[in-house]
Amino acid sequence: MPHAGISFHARRHRGRLCASSGLAMLALSCVAAPAVAQSQRDQSASEAPAAVQPTPSPVLPVQSANATPGPYQTYDALAMRGWERPLPKSGDTLLGDKLGVRDALADAGIGFIGFASNAIQYNFLQNDGGYKGRQLYNAQKLTRNVSNAAIFATYDLGRIGITNGQFIFSALYTSNSFNRVDGPNATRIGRLAYYQSLFNKKVEFKIGYFDNGFEFLGTQTGGSLAGGTLGPQASVPNEVGLSYSGFSTPTANIRINFKNHVYTKLGIQRSLPPGGATPEVAANSSGLRFHIPGTGLLTIGEVGWDQPAKPGTLATWVRAGGIYNSTNFNRFQGGQSKDNWATYIAVDHQLFQIDDSKANRGLYVGGTVNYAPPQQNFISQYYEGRIYGVGLVKSRPFDLASIVANANIYSKQGLVARTAAGQGNFKQTYSVIASYAYRLTPGLYFQPGIGAVVHPIYSPRFDTAVNGYLTLTFFI
């Protein structure tokens, strides 16, 4: 019987839209994005897919556009570079500048931030018509869909004469209570990379071991992981082999920044195996293996316009791209494809501002479309609309409220191949999720959410689920 599930993960990435403060790297879990159904990411074309249920992911703070005074400016100058949206600033951590830890490390050119997140979800209706078999989708019963802990460290290579260069390291532990759908438990190297900017940041490149989930696409609602994996949850990029948070591969990226906030970015990575994280971890538990049999080269290209919020200037981020993977994937109707590919487009726009001193505060709308060929990708189309507010409550400038609606369209060939004889199926899954990321104190975020998921699994035909979501995230 087919199984289903969703997941977190981003899946994640240079702080502009919403002038967002750091994404909580929770995305580490990702991400991109509630992100996509992990189960889908972890299965090849010949395997049963998971249900496409969205799940909010670790919360991440929306930072102020204002510079943080005092020693924090020194700490933040050592923050990890090269993401589409940055990690939280050091002032938005539980440790802050206490105990002299950051001072001592900064004196040596070292920056660091720690992060941990736990997310659960549950279908309040419990309306599966008396079904007594194994769990098929997230929230069918109380599900801990992600628990992550990560440490990020950087070293300023200017200390040894490499101006504007940075060495980046991260390690991650990830686990969940539903491995069959949400992916394997793992402890892995997350990043081991060299970043360099040239010509006053007109050119940026990064090479080493890292994931592209937070380097492209921009799958965090409001540009912030803190509020973020509630939005763009499309799994299409991951289905075709793009690496995502917690599952890095050898990668090289280059970004060129033109005038008027226009940019283009190109990435080359070793593909994840067909099936995603499960075969990746089975063959590469440490995360340091350069090549895995059966994987090819994946390239991704993106062009965009990323206008940051300024007093009187509304934020707008438009991006579009394509992915090509030389890896062979099983086709649903037999045989193998010689490659795989996907396309995407996404737009986010600030409708109005509510605080001239913090221009990122205000109301935003956005949308995302993903497509991949249905011959070998079970989710072939993904559509999303979102509306979200940053600091809408006067006394709550760091909070993020969001409503995200999406539709996942299944491959017709895939449904034929994966639906058990005598059972019906659904051709798509729809969901609407509302959530509020509440900053309890600097470095600590609490994110409750509620959502309706129509067709939580493609087969058998279960009724609409009404899920509660709860995520607690903290930064050290």
Q: In which residue ranges do the predicted regions lie?
A:
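Long, well-ordered hydrophobic secondary-structure segments characteristic of membrane-embedded
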Residues: 83, 90-193
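N-terminal periplasmic/intermembrane-space "pro-region" immediately following the signal or transit peptide
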Residues: 2-8, 24, 29, 34-119, ...
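Short loop/turn motifs that connect adjacent beta-strands in outer-membrane beta-barrel proteins
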Residues: 89, 95-112, 124-125, 154-167, ...
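Outer membrane beta-barrel
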Residues: 142-274, 377-417
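Outer-membrane beta-barrel architecture
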Residues: 100-102, 152-154, 193-195, 253-255, ...
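Outer-membrane beta-barrel "beta-signal"
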Residues: 464-476
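Outer membrane beta-barrel transmembrane domains
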Residues: 275-293, 302-304, 321-337, 341, ...
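Transmembrane beta-strands of outer-membrane beta-barrel proteins
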Residues: 110-118, 165-169, 203-207, 260-266, ...
